[in-house]
Amino acid sequence: NAYACSPGMGSEPGMAWNWVSNLAKFCELYIITEGEFRDRIEEVVPTLEQGKNMHFYYNPVSEEIRKMCWNQGDWRFYKYYKEWQWKTYLLAKDICKVEKMDVLHQLNMIGFREPGYLWKLSQENGVPFVWGPVDAKDKFPVAYLDGAGLKTKLFMRLKNFLTGIQLRCSGRVRKAAHQASVIFSASSNSQRSFKKYMGIDSPLLNETGCYVQEHPIMDKSGKDTFDVLWVGKMDFRKQLGLALKSVAKSGNDKLRLHIVGGGDAEFYQSLAESYGIADK
């Protein structure tokens, strides 16, 4: 079960694609995904040696729901996402009647709030259920709210409050967690959450990986600058502002910060100017 899955992308779609395209080198996969990236998937799969092991099933949603998904913070999406997960469960049930499965894997989205229903299918047919990697941090660090606007402070504190309630009280989350043969935690914070709220030990496995590459070590001792690369979405949660503030406070004229990502670039450009580091 991989709601967002696409080659050539980052974030959730790229994460899921890298999981399934690499698992397919060792396993035959039956992958249920949303239909937004169907064209990309069907263009690339035939070019892969392991493509013969990748069988995609599509459960598409409307363009309006897709916009809600991409607009992170639009909580209306969870209603439709839950409905999508139920339809996916029914589709998976039909697939299991035809194909023999060894594992049911709930891959993404990685947030714990919506665990899908493959755990229920596991209860019904006895096929082992695996969940994760899962992001189950119990709170956004409130120290990061320093300098944030009132709206952001209220939103993040409300989110922290609701997250705590869901970790303690969500029946479906707890059922999924206890049905799982294994849960992979995407972070040490998530590990602590599963242990604290559900008494479950979960191995640590970050959702993103990398391809091991060998490059010659370059001697950079003669460089005039110290270059730092920051990659991410330019929004409050990723704390680019903290990186800019750190550069400003360092007072190091040789420090250069290279920023790659999408989002509110104008805001962070003006913030850099206000710190007097726009040329860095």
Language model: regions and residue ranges:
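N-terminal subdomain of nucleotide-sugar transferases
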Residues: 1-52, 123-127, 182
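Conserved donor-binding/catalytic core segment of Leloir-type glycosyltransferases
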Residues: 134, 219-238, 244-249, 258
